[in-house]
Amino acid sequence: MEEFSTIGLDAVVGSVGNGSTLRLISDIEGVRYTEGRFLPYFFPDTFHEGGDPVKEAKENWITARRAILRKPIDRIGYGGYLKLTLDFPEFLDYVENMCNEFRELYTNAKGITPYCVKKVAVLNSWGKIRSWGCHMVHHALYQKQNYSYAGIIEALSGAPFDVRFISFDDILANPEILKDLDVIINVGDGDTAHTGGGIWENPAISAAIREFVYNGGGFIGVGEPSGHQFQGHYLQLADMLGVEKETGFTLNYDKYNWEEHPDHFILADTTKPVDFGEGKKNIFAYEDTEILVQREKEVQMAVHEFGKGRCVYISGLPYSFENSRILYRSILWSTHGEKDLHQWFSSNFNVEVHAYVKNGRFCVVNNTYARQKTVVYRGDGSSFPLEMEANEIKWYNI
């Protein structure tokens, strides 16, 4: 919020549950510093005989580190009863190593805009005022009804994109803002503030978005994008997306398109059937749509071209390293950016690359608790093989 810079607030300190909560804090402007309080809190529920605070600390740090590499907070800390840590020297050793890693990270990344392959806007009814928190329920707690959508935001929190959050009112006030974007993402259930609800009855909204895509922009819809029953359609961008939801009004329509096309750019790195989380029922495809995944004649993923632009439909995408790669490839494909794949890129989706070109540095980070092998691609497309220890981060000069 712009008010942070005018109310005399010195700093914002927040608890870090994942990458989204980290970005919610670190993206705040107009304060002297931002600080993240990491888990575990120094309370007896973790710091007791037989407890494993190191495990929780590792999980929390590795999850948040992706986001810190995109937009660092200024300080890190913990909260609770310090005395409880005295019986866990291995925890103190891990925190020392974590702090040293943070200092190096901060030195290389603070104040430097990292390499961003595309400009991405998450479109909902709130826009910037709920940046990163739009799919968050009580500080990133798991909710069955929400995790399939929150995964999109979590993946974006540590991905090499220039991410912004825009509202439908922003588009109505100035449709020209879309010209500065590469792709729009609309994610959530229909008839909610996440996807817009009744705002789709305003023709100016659908006209602006259709124009953006028709002229070459990308659109990714997750769940029930543009979902609102109006003028014979539930998905108001059904013709653009190439899919529609059967709500009972078109049961007598023949639906012939069920053939899957799994050999697609978007799915090239998948190692197992795609995890759509809760997924969606009753989604069908139009005849000129390319279905990537359907299960029991319910479309879970599809792509469709609209004018010069491209659209991707996904029924849900919980956060995982593999799903993060699927979203990455979806964004590239929707923006005709396949040629940009091998720029600051890791062939292994468990490993990520972040480049700080202005600073002349880049890093490769292993997001897992196991050794990993990968091929790292530099900005010019050249590459080198790399083996990494669990959780390791390596820094290089460009």
How would you describe each model-predicted region?
Residues 10-14, 175-198:
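Short, well-ordered secondary-structure micro-motifs within conserved domains or adaptor modules
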Residues 30-32, 215-218, 309:
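A short helix->loop->beta-strand "cap" motif at the edges of active sites that frequently abuts
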